[in-house]
Amino acid sequence: MLYTLIVGLGRSGLGLHVPVLSRARSQVPGIFADHPIVGVDPGDTARAERRDLLIADSLRRARDLLEPARTVVHLCTPPAVRAEVLREVAALGFSRILMEKPLAGDLDTLRCVLRLAREQELRLAVVAPWLHSTLTRRLVQLVGNRRLGAVRSVSVTQHKPRFRRSLSTGSHTSAFDVEAPHAVGLLLRLLGDAQLRGARCADLRVGTTTVPDMGGAHLELLHTGGIRSAVLSDLSAPVRQRRIVLGMEDGSVVGHYAVGQDDDFAQWEITRDGHTTREVFRDDSLTACLTHAYRGYAEGGDGTGAGDLGLHVRTVELLDEAKRLADLSPAGGTHPHKEALSHGR
């Protein structure tokens, strides 16, 4: 059975992974060892004690509390320091690594991560709840069986208010790293590989404070089959929304992903011949994602499969290109692709 080490006790590690794993350990027998989850926070930002969490003051101390050969490491540190922490984790003998999305924040970090994985024989998997979502599975089936004919276009909207975290922490430096990795991975799964056709980002402004590149992100893709897709993520929106719209040859589909762990239900609306049907269903995608990874590791695999890792690599490549395109500016000029979202205080 497998032990758990969570590295990085911020929003993802402490706020999402710990409670989801605590539930999964009681729901999925035969995979998880009867041992507390061990957590380490390299940034020393979280000292909250929980009954189901044992906090170690260093990675070396965590190694002494666990068996590295039977431990899954959840790497929940910010993208900018991920390669450095991965190197330290690997040096301590851990090899099963479950990484928060995105796999890397840029191409240099991606190359470093993949090189470490090869040299240290790491079994990498990426936390990608949308790829394990019931809604995604239904969408893949609908596109594949051509129930509504061929896909004409797809758009993904990812809105949420992220003021406090963007103003108080530097865990992310680009809106392309917050919600967009979910959407790009989903689009690659649904429609196949793609080329970037446009990108822009927005600064977040609250009163006199500006957080560069954290107001929102927009990108456009052209897939190999000729289908166009778009992603729009507004991190200053007043409400949460995670929506996908498929324009089909014989109708349309609107899907709504669960917007938080407090209400894990998704829904979709299918319109055909002027008639719309709506269905609501349970969709605990993060639990499904983590248990899938643990089952893969328990069976001796890499947690997700080589194909999934390739999809995550391609996601990083497209997002890195989007960041560079959004930052393009003529000499001496302003950013032509950058908007500013301004909010009074």
Predicted region positions:
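C-terminal helix-rich "cap/oligomerization" subdomain common to oxidoreductases
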Residues: A24-G30, P42, V72-H74, H292-R345
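A short helix->loop->beta-strand "cap" motif at the edges of active sites that frequently abuts
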Residues: D34, L92-S95, Q120-L122
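N-terminal Rossmann-like dinucleotide-binding module
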Residues: M1-D52
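Hydrophobic residues in well-ordered beta-strands that form the structural core
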Residues: L98-M99, L124-V126, G255
